[in-house]
């Protein structure tokens, strides 16, 4: 299960934080590190601060975009302070660990950490199913990157060990499969296209409508079959109203006999 947990760092600017993160991961049994458009590449300082976890640094996957790091994941949790400007489903660290451990038995799970100074952007946070806030001292809530990784990695390990001790059979607890983030993004693109052609939203300025719809579907979290039904509905609307069709390579959402 632990091999399915991805620790994703977005635009990290200090190699020392990469090394300290690798150390925090390895102490909890996590080894799958993704670096999204790092401002610096891992170097000798990263190796030194990894304190024996240089293998995690050496195997790190470096990608250009967050979408690449999230590809194939069924659950994405982004670290964020609570925000009134972008209300989103929130998790406490303990619940984050429990959900991550459970879903990682069936598909990859990504825990996403933002830039050292400014965190994740709103657009990046909207790619997450949940946000997690670490309840630090409000009078001094300054956690560095590796500390935040250590806390969430610990919660994942505790949940993993609890499941091991309970000897919970995967078959008995298997939930209906959720769509991967790639499928969700294609659904959102399809939805925006149909709403634009219908005149419900302005294609050049979708504004807050798509953000609110993303939040709605994030709360509902449709299963894979339910998402296929929604895609099929959109495809039916396109055909009925004779909208321009999408590329022939995109077959998602078509009904099956």
Curated annotation (Swiss-Prot):
It is found in: Cytoplasm. GO terms for molecular function: RNA binding; tRNA (cytidine(32)/uridine(32)-2'-O)-methyltransferase activity. One of its GO terms (biological process) is tRNA nucleoside ribose methylation. It comes from the Bacteria. Residues 238-257 are annotated as: Disordered. The keyword DNA damage does not apply. It catalyses: cytidine(32) in tRNA + S-adenosyl-L-methionine = 2'-O-methylcytidine(32) in tRNA + S-adenosyl-L-homocysteine + H(+); uridine(32) in tRNA + S-adenosyl-L-methionine = 2'-O-methyluridine(32) in tRNA + S-adenosyl-L-homocysteine + H(+). Belongs to the class IV-like SAM-binding methyltransferase superfamily. RNA methyltransferase TrmH family. This is tRNA (cytidine/uridine-2'-O-)-methyltransferase TrmJ. The gene is trmJ.
């Amino acid at each position: 299960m632990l091999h399915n947990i991805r620790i994703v760092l977005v635009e990290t600017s200090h190699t020392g934080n990469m090394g300290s993160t690798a150390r925090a991961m390895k102490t909890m049994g996590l080894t799958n590190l993704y670096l999204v458009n790092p401002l610096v590449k891992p170097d000798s300082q990263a190796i030194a601060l990894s304190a024996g976890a240089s293998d995690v640094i050496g195997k790190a996957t470096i990608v250009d975009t967050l979408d690449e790091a999230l590809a194939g994941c069924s659950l994405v949790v982004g670290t964020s302070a609570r925000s009134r400007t972008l209300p989103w489903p929130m998790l406490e660290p303990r619940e984050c660990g429990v959900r991550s451990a459970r879903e990682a038995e069936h598909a990859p799970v990504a825990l996403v950490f933002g830039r050292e100074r400014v965190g994740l952007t709103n657009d990046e946070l909207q790619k997450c199913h949940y946000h997690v806030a670490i309840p630090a001292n409000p009078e001094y809530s300054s956690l560095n990157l590796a500390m935040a990784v250590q806390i969430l990695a610990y919660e994942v390990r505790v949940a993993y060990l609890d499941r091991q001790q309970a000897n919970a059979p995967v078959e008995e607890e298997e939930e209906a499969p959720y769509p991967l983030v790639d499928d969700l993004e294609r659904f959102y693109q399809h939805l925006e296209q149909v709403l634009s052609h219908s005149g419900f939203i302005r294609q050049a300025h979708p504004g807050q409508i798509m953000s609110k719809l993303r939040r709605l579907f994030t709360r509902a979290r449709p299963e894979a079959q339910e998402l296929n039904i929604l895609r099929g509905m959109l495809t039916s609307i396109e055909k009925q109203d004779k909208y321009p069709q999408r590329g022939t390579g995109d077959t998602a959402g078509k009904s099956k006999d």
